[in-house]
Amino acid sequence: FTPFLFLVVSCVLNIFLDILFIVPLKMGVKGSAWATVLSQALAALGAFVYAFVRYKELRFRKEDLKPSGSLIYEHIRLGIPLGFQWSNLFIGIIIMSAAVIPFDMIDSTSMVAGNPAQVGYGISNKLSAILMGIFSAIGTALLSFISQNKGAKKYDRIRKGFDFSCKLSIILSFFCVTLGLLLTINGAYQYFFLSKESISEASIKYGNAYLYVALPFYIALAFIYIGRNTVQALEKPLFPLLSGVVELIARTLICLFLPT
């Protein structure tokens, strides 16, 4: 619960600093960036201080400064595949964003007013990211749960945690798909992120098209998060790494050859 409190404090502080830097101080986009950095830095500092004060075993000692080759190797072996999962996600977003731009181009030198394809994709992607965050959180929680129980050799709890995560993800995927489809009615979700003047029939058309294709596959996405994090927690990092590479290649090829 304590990490959640630090997250809440970070969000509230971010909102307060956004208002302070943008309205009275008139710092614009730079002010918004500073607000984000400062709020996250202060929350991280608070979390570190709390952890070191509350848990004596986490405090630094002189012997901790001595590098351990085996420990460094384990961090790299397990950390790179896990980090690549997030890199894969954001690289994929960049690739897909580049594939959307041609839909707004009239010719090689001019574009459609308002860039409706980019606007529609961008906003639908934000909604999708919010809904996908549920499955990402389940996967992350499962990773920690399985890792701890593997260390404690409580393999029956690993099986129960895996089964429960699958059942919960199935239920939540139906909820997310239903909610997402309801929000596509008249492009309702776009009004959460944009002013009325920035929304057009074309932006709604493009955004809804993205969601109509993506939403039905949330159940598959949920099992991807569960499967990857389970295998990662069992210290088998090669398979999540290879699946991430395959996913990135597939995403790239689809963006290159499928759009028309």
Cite the ranges covered by each PLM segment.
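Hydrophobic alpha-helical transmembrane segments in multi-pass membrane proteins
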Residues: 11, 44, 82-94, 98, ...
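Alpha-helical transmembrane segments and their lipid-water interface positions
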Residues: 14, 18, 22, 43-51, ...
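Hydrophobic/aromatic residues within transmembrane alpha-helices of membrane transport systems
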Residues: 9, 21, 28, 38, ...
